[in-house]
């Protein structure tokens, strides 16, 4: 009898090679989310809403998360427009107890969670950190942009482990790779760099129970989170971006759909940059 081959990174996988999934032969079917349940934080507007609607268009039932902007009407819209089940949930992602409660509610209401997008985030708009008094603003960024992601991942990961499958997608940022100019935002950059590496780290840990973890790093996108930028700052953004403009939220959804669907069953630990080429030069 030949000796068993065991993984160096995940011995819990058992004897190698692992079994490949059975996939549809039609490429369009690979991108279908029919029969899946998706949960998207920060989805009352901006990137999160674009992703939630795209998932509904692909056939998924969708749980929308909001904090300050009620999204019940948007959930109703998804149901009426695309014939999927949709419901809005209010949650403060900086509160781990609230996160756990909402994720458990979603599992109860929908039966499970197959896809989770940790997207909620806030921007740093206070300039050079050395000029900021105290640590409240730092804590605000880290609590939402990093801790909130971890709280969501830690809780939904339990569901994925139970199901032996699942896809976690973390919205990171090109700011986790580069240092932004002309605006200075060290706390945001640090939080997003941590998000990118958290995704990579979890991808190795969660592979043992069949779940995948990836991140997406948008560049400058036309959403409310960028409203702090004045026209002169945006001109500099355009000059620094090879495509010469900001992106639309709809230009991101293809990457999210890929990572959510069976088109990406061999993709884990990846960070997809959708930044108009900003990080290339």
Swiss-Prot record:
It catalyses: D-sorbitol + NADP(+) = keto-L-sorbose + NADPH + H(+). Its EC number is 1.1.1.289. Pathway: Carbohydrate degradation; L-sorbose degradation. One of its GO terms (biological process) is L-sorbose catabolic process. GO terms for molecular function: mannitol 2-dehydrogenase (NADP+) activity; oxidoreductase activity, acting on NAD(P)H, oxygen as acceptor; sorbose reductase activity. Optimum pH is 6.2. InterPro entries: NAD(P)-bd_dom_sf (IPR036291), SDR_fam (IPR002347). Keywords: Carbohydrate metabolism, NADP, Oxidoreductase. The active site is at 173 (proton donor), 188 (proton donor), 192 (lowers pka of active site tyr). Pfam families: adh_short_C2. The keyword Transmembrane does not apply. NADP(+) binds at residues 47, 74, 119, 188, 192, 221, 223. Signal peptide: none annotated. Homotetramer. Catalyzes the NADP dependent reduction of L-sorbose to D-glucitol. Can also convert fructose to mannitol, but less efficiently. Belongs to the short-chain dehydrogenases/reductases (SDR) family. This is Sorbose reductase SOU1. It comes from Candida albicans (strain SC5314 / ATCC MYA-2876) (Yeast).
